[in-house]
Amino acid sequence: MNKIRKTFQYGKHEVTFETGEMARQATGAVVVRMGDTVLLVSVVAKKEAEEGRDFFPLTVNYQEKTYAAGKIPGGYFKREGRPTEKETLTSRLIDRPLRPLFPKGFTNEVQVIATVLSVDSKVPTDIPAILGASAAIGLSGIPFNGSLGAARVGYRGGEYLLNPSLDELKDSALDLVVAGTRDAVLMVESEAQELPESVMLGAVLHGHQAMQVAIQAIAEFIQEAGGAKWEWEPPTVNTALEKLVVEKSEAPLKKAYQIQEKTARQAQIQAIRDQLLADRAAEREGEENAVNEHELAVIFHELERRIVREQILTGQPRIDGRDTKTVRPITVKVGVLPRSHGSALFTRGETQALVVTTLGTERDAQSIDDLDGDRQEEFIFHYNFPPFCVGEVGFMSGPKRREIGHGRLAKRAVVPVVPTLDKFPYVIRVVSEILESNGSSSMASVCGSSLALMDAGVPTKAPVAGIAMGLIKENDKYAVLSDILGDEDHLGDMDFKVAGTSNGVTALQMDIKIEGITKEIMEQALDQAKEGRLHILSIMNKVLDKPRSQVSDLAPQYVTMKINPEKIRDVIGKGGVVIREITEATNCAIDISDDGTIKIAAHTTEEGEAAKRRIEELTAEVELGKVYEGTVVKITDFGAFVQILPNTQGLVHISQIAQERVENVRDYLEEGQVIRVKVIEIDRQGRVRLSMKQID
């Protein structure tokens, strides 16, 4: 295969696609370069689909190699290990816009691998990874509906920024990634500083317009490479079986979808499905061709989809009896766990999140070592989705991709209102335990985390709430749904999550399964989401509308002090012996900054004050004329040395011991004796002269 190269200008960056030199045994492979960021993106697909498979097995793996940044991995083995959180999140970011572009009925196994070979600190890797995946799939000839583009959009000084660098993002009020085709937006992922809905929508449209140059370049690159298209035809529909399923199951399914309780509804639907299968098996008894359960399940699912969608588009109540704008009943409790620092139980319909906040010291910060460099995360958010929350039996292991993704979305939503470490000296960990789930558990986590943070006394800027929106669209008819159920998410055309305060949006995530989503539809969804968000906030505010005035007594108690930086060595001691003795004696954690700032984290205020006193004694300066209580440490013929501070001794000359003449120092003093002395002189060398007889 000849080497093919395509270069185009994308904003301020030059982007290059190459194929034909690397990874030539893959079904499709592209090396994409943007600035000095270089990725190899490969795609491999099996030629045959597995019999009876009713889903599309797409796997996307994004992996970072430390050599890309000129680094050697840490740890004993000195090689890359399990995927990092960033790798998992980027894999999901690539997967989400790709998946809806594969044709319905295509069930061949496909794997996309994006490998970072070189990283430029000015160019984040996710945008070139998405572009490379689109180009590689296009080259492979796998059935795929169009070229996919992607763009990052920032917002600073009232202007949108296209593909900003990491440094520019630090000053940006918005970090938004949008992916789409020539005619449609398919995916949005963003974090914002309480921006208006109009600015968010403008960013989406700006990014979609800007990515057209990339979409055109990918199409030209694929055409120039001239890969052969796969010969694939969608599976034909068995019209006779389809008619039979409709006749036998449509009426009972419509009744089943009037059942508002999720578990009962699912049980009834399963019973209808089982009965259909049993009836079909009885009818085919003795025939050579057995019942095709897979074919039956596909038709049954399509019937479910049509029933639910028609019900909504014709103005009938939704599955649980609501109209399109109504939010499910909400209950809120705070302070539900007696020994946690902050907790909240947020229930919305059949979705429930128990969210717990824990406050820790700087030593509890999470160390991150990736291609962007080493850093500390002072705000940690974890989301757990155990199998019992959906009434299932499942294997309990580490967090799955979905849990990591939902946790990051909830974290994005609340980060803009959480104080930085210099304003609130605690490392914060929030854990959301999903106890029940029927749609929008990530948004329940947002609401619960805002409440749990305020319950813990974290001075957040404002309460935050989130809501998941849905869309049902057939031709020109559509309905935007507020607070969607799990079934509405599964059977609908859009999952649109919006979180924010009463002032503006802090996070927006959108996944669209169809084309034809207009600006007007997105505007309506954002406006309807704002209405729902403000409604949820009003309920939350009735229970807790601002942070508690102080942190929990169970949280670490901070005492902060400042010392002369030259005295730091006195506090630490040789080999750390002094500070270790203080921490053990007072049961405190002590952190010292180079500028002399000392943070003492204690279990109680008393322990913190005790540690502070010890440090004050160690760093105190001797004051001329002040009376001290000291210990005699050494006696000589000409006087006695007395320790008046932990690191300071002074001399009481024999002439300063008593009013009368002293012939022998030992007649008046002994080693270990505690006496009161007055500082009468500090010479240029810092030597201290003391007196006993000059004390009034």
UniProtKB/Swiss-Prot annotation:
Keywords: Cytoplasm, Magnesium, Metal-binding, Nucleotidyltransferase, RNA-binding, Transferase. It holds the Pfam family PNPase. Mg(2+) binds at residues 489, 495. This is Polyribonucleotide nucleotidyltransferase. One of its GO terms (biological process) is RNA processing. Involved in mRNA degradation. Catalyzes the phosphorolysis of single-stranded polyribonucleotides processively in the 3'- to 5'-direction. It is found in: Cytoplasm. It catalyses: RNA(n+1) + phosphate = RNA(n) + a ribonucleoside 5'-diphosphate. One of its GO terms (molecular function) is polyribonucleotide nucleotidyltransferase activity.
